[in-house]
């Protein structure tokens, strides 16, 4: 629950909405994979339609069409009848995204969504989100520790320092060597991506501040 402040979407205070109404505004892809292991992939993604089912909980053709589209977008169609408990961590992460897409909201919140994905599925995942921001005018907010992915895919970034927003702006303006060295307390180099020109963050591996001593291991 909200502890302080207010969150407004299109002039509406989200805290004043019933949870079902709020679920039609924003969907969440959590870091923890909280999926029923005995459910099939299809059943798990169908849960995203809950805010639209009414008191009887009956699904219709539209609901199943949206679920099938979400499965296709996340490359899960071939796994639709598999039990979630049989999937790898990366596959379960894609199920969470498919469930959120099936919720069909204008806002999508994601917490470290690429943690359990290999390089191919990271690219598929983030490219899909980029496409949806254009095709559906979707607003996507992502928490990422991978600064290179943030620099490559984000339109705007917010850099945190000690739990508060330190800087916001375009990746090239925020993800600079000076800013990152201060926030992370370690020297870094930032170079342009060879094809896209976006910032690539490289730790300064030869810096003495990066050396691990026996005293560090004892502390």
Question: What is each model feature region?
Answer:
Residues 46, 61-79, 104:
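Conserved ABC ATPase "signature" region
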Residues 183-219:
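ABC ATPase nucleotide-binding domains
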Residues 83-87, 91:
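Conserved ABC ATPase signature
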Residues 5-13, 22:
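Conserved ABC transporter NBD signature motif
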Residues 157-170:
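H-loop (His-switch) and adjacent beta-strand-loop-beta switch element
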Residues 108-112:
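Catalytic Walker B motif of ABC-type/P-loop ATPase nucleotide-binding domains
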Residues 123-136:
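Helical segment within the ABC ATPase nucleotide-binding domain
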């Amino acid at each position: 629950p909200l502890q302080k402040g207010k969150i407004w979407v299109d002039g509406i205070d989200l805290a004043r909405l019933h949870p079902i109404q709020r679920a039609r505004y924003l969907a969440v892809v959590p870091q923890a994979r909280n999926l029923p292991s005995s459910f099939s992939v299809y059943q798990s993604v169908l849960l995203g339609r809950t805010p639209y089912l009414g008191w009887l909980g009956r699904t219709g053709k539209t609901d199943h069409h949206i679920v099938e589209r979400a499965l296709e977008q996340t490359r899960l169609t071939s796994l639709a009848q598999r039990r979630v408990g049989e999937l790898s961590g990366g596959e379960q992460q894609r199920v969470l995204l498919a469930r959120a897409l099936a919720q069909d909201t204008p806002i999508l919140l994601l917490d470290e969504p690429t943690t359990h994905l290999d390089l191919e599925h990271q690219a598929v995942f983030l490219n899909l989100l980029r496409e949806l921001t254009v095709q559906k005018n979707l607003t996507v907010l992502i928490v990422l520790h991978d600064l290179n992915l943030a620099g490559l895919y984000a339109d705007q970034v917010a850099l945190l320092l000690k739990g508060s927003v330190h800087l916001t702006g375009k990746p090239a303006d925020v993800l600079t060597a000076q800013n990152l060295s201060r926030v992370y307390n370690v020297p870094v180099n930032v170079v342009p991506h060879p094809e896209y020109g976006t910032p690539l963050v490289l730790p300064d591996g030869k810096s003495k501040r990066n050396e691990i001593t026996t005293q560090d291991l004892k502390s």
